[in-house]
Amino acid sequence: MLQCAPKKNERLRGSCDFCTQSKLRCNKNKPSCRRCTIQQQPCVYSVARRTGRPPKHPRKANDCQEANGQHGEQDPVTSTPGGSCQQQSNHLLDVEGDGANFTLADASTTAQGRETAASSALDNALLVGETFGFSSLLDDPLIQSDDFLSFSLCMPPGEEEGHMASPRALNGSTGPCSPTVLSSIDVPHLPARFGFLESSVESGLHGRTGPHLVEQPDKIVPSSFSEMEKIYDEGLTFSGLDSAINAVTNNGKGEPSASGTMAAHPHSKRQCFCSTSMSKLQMLISHPTLCQKNSRARFDMTLFLEEVVFNIHRDVLQCLVCQSKSLHSLASLCICTDWVIEALRDVAQDLSSGQDNLGGFRAGLCPPKDKFSICVGRFVLDDQLRESCTRSLVKYRLRKLVPIMDTMMKLNYRGAGGALSQAIRTMVEDVRHKIESALGMMEL
């Protein structure tokens, strides 16, 4: 980048989205900052996303648009489409669960905050590799290659597609991918008999990126991997719950159906579906197929239900209608959370007893006979490292449920008291005890 003269640009006043340094004007009339110039790195300053007050007069707005036109030949890294000088304002509150605590963050955060969050997420993804037992592989000279960070679930040639992996893992299996795929191991996926929910494998693996929803008057059906990924990324668990209930009830036969109204606007100001989603979750958990005696739920189905519990709890916290939390809703959510804890504790018990190196599970991340293997670069993890990965995954899921129970206890104190409030308090304490017991079992 060319050296910039220390002349302050009055029109492009603001700060860099990356390093929050003041702006300078260089001899090419491109906005940049001092730190990016010194370190010879592309400056991520964007006029459209700059912070500050909007122009008070239309003439100033026109001047701003002219300035954007003058800088139309900027570097692609620093330029953004459009030339708007508008501010993005969104007063909704997002609830972020980082596995240790819940924090309320204003959704109108600047691009600087998003860049910082993305950077920290990348660092966390690299640190996750150590907890999953990958640190022992880092010293191997053969692993120092460009595709080392290609973390995916690989299937030997000639095998049938009997078990569907997560969309991110499948997309990563076709070639090198970003380091953030290291954290995709905790993305839940449905069991093999729910494979019809993710039918369009080829369309998801051959360059199809745009969403394509099959819209009908009464339902919205996902038709590709990208749409399934979008549904779960946006927290639209209603469609997934309806599909899972239909699959469990009909043994995977028939087409899944979901109410388009509930799947489209889970946080609508006029309608609230938090209690509806919890009722659907409780209906699925209490179904005889998942509650048979002397049988345990599939590992991937447990991960799917745990993710649904986490998303529903987040929806309840950020819902604009649920100003006063219902004790009946808390009781339903606590019952569902208790079921997930029991299922994860069964997995922890099998891991502690060393039962057949995960072969005792009916299915999951590592089915028998190495039909799917966890790969890091050119290496396939052996049984010991696969067990370490699953153990770390179960620990992460258990610890992620701890702040949910803490928040339940705080919301319960807001109630009027009585027998139901006391019952919820007892259930929360019992679930916390089960979490601590399972974590202690895995530490032994």
From Swiss-Prot:
* Positions of the UniProt region annotated as Disordered: 49-87
Would the keyword Nucleus be found if you checked this record's keyword annotation?
yes
Question: Where is it found, in Gene Ontology cellular component terms?
Answer: nucleus
User: In the UniProt record for this chain, what is stated about the effect of gene disruption?
Assistant: Abolishes the production of AF-toxins and their precuror 9,10-epoxy-8-hydroxy-9-methyl-decatrienoic acid; and impairs the pathogenicity.
Basic residues: compositionally biased ranges:
50-59
GO molecular function list: DNA binding; DNA-binding transcription factor activity, RNA polymerase II-specific; zinc ion binding
Keywords of the record, alphabetical order, are: DNA-binding, Metal-binding, Nucleus, Transcription, Transcription regulation
Residue ranges: DNA binding: 16-43
Miscellaneous note of the record: Gene clusters encoding host-selective toxins (HSTs) are localized on conditionally dispensable chromosomes (CDCs), also called supernumerary chromosomes, where they are present in multiple copies. The CDCs are not essential for saprophytic growth but controls host-selective pathogenicity.
Q: What is this protein called?
A: Transcription activator AKTR-1
Organism of derivation: Alternaria alternata
What lineage does the source organism belong to? Eukaryota, Fungi, Dikarya, Ascomycota, Pezizomycotina
